[in-house]
């Protein structure tokens, strides 16, 4: 890869989106303009408590989707009803920062989300009060990196976009400018 390579979405953010947000919210300081800090992709595998091989498929899928080795998440407490013991692997997560984060967001917005059948847009009510956005995907087949013939079972995932926005409105404006397909008030995609 060339040394002066900049991801497409990152250069669009720097050239177009930052000035738009500064005029829209009338920020006096450029450091007040919201930006994306990191993207966390989490895949919980509850069936791993019964079959320990299930976690390997989740690790392989997350590695293919994000291009980064996932961190294995283990149970903190034993729960008898779920036949779960403390320390058993129950999920995997990847934290993306920098250029990998921008490349993942670009692939997610331009390739993966449009491939979802009957996709009507993301809900814009899933902000946490501080400008961070979390949404869930029901299966991993929408990513081109996953070979549909080789998956053993569909696995969902949670994706959290952490921003430097102070309010939900700033975070919503940032993600809308980046190209997140939010639903409107009437339920239609904007």
From Swiss-Prot:
<dbReference type="InterPro" id="IPR031309">
    <property type="entry name" value="Ribosomal_uL5_C"/>
</dbReference>
<dbReference type="GO" id="GO:0019843">
    <property type="term" value="F:rRNA binding"/>
</dbReference>
<comment type="function">
    <text>This is one of the proteins that bind and probably mediate the attachment of the 5S RNA into the large ribosomal subunit, where it forms part of the central protuberance. In the 70S ribosome it contacts protein S13 of the 30S subunit (bridge B1b), connecting the 2 subunits; this bridge is implicated in subunit movement. Contacts the P site tRNA; the 5S rRNA and some of its associated proteins might help stabilize positioning of ribosome-bound tRNAs.</text>
</comment>
<dbReference type="Pfam" id="PF00673">
    <property type="entry name" value="Ribosomal_L5_C"/>
</dbReference>
<comment type="similarity">
    <text>Belongs to the universal ribosomal protein uL5 family.</text>
</comment>
<keyword id="KW-0689">Ribosomal protein</keyword>
<dbReference type="Pfam" id="PF00281">
    <property type="entry name" value="Ribosomal_L5"/>
</dbReference>
<keyword id="KW-0699">rRNA-binding</keyword>
<dbReference type="InterPro" id="IPR031310">
    <property type="entry name" value="Ribosomal_uL5_N"/>
</dbReference>
<dbReference type="GO" id="GO:0000049">
    <property type="term" value="F:tRNA binding"/>
</dbReference>
<dbReference type="GO" id="GO:0006412">
    <property type="term" value="P:translation"/>
</dbReference>
<dbReference type="InterPro" id="IPR002132">
    <property type="entry name" value="Ribosomal_uL5"/>
</dbReference>
<dbReference type="GO" id="GO:1990904">
    <property type="term" value="C:ribonucleoprotein complex"/>
</dbReference>
<dbReference type="GO" id="GO:0005840">
    <property type="term" value="C:ribosome"/>
</dbReference>
<dbReference type="InterPro" id="IPR022803">
    <property type="entry name" value="Ribosomal_uL5_dom_sf"/>
</dbReference>
<dbReference type="InterPro" id="IPR020930">
    <property type="entry name" value="Ribosomal_uL5_bac-type"/>
</dbReference>
<protein>
    <recommendedName>
        <fullName>Large ribosomal subunit protein uL5</fullName>
    </recommendedName>
</protein>
<keyword id="KW-0687">Ribonucleoprotein</keyword>
<comment type="subunit">
    <text>Part of the 50S ribosomal subunit; part of the 5S rRNA/L5/L18/L25 subcomplex. Contacts the 5S rRNA and the P site tRNA. Forms a bridge to the 30S subunit in the 70S ribosome.</text>
</comment>
<keyword id="KW-0820">tRNA-binding</keyword>
<dbReference type="GO" id="GO:0003735">
    <property type="term" value="F:structural constituent of ribosome"/>
</dbReference>
<keyword id="KW-0694">RNA-binding</keyword>
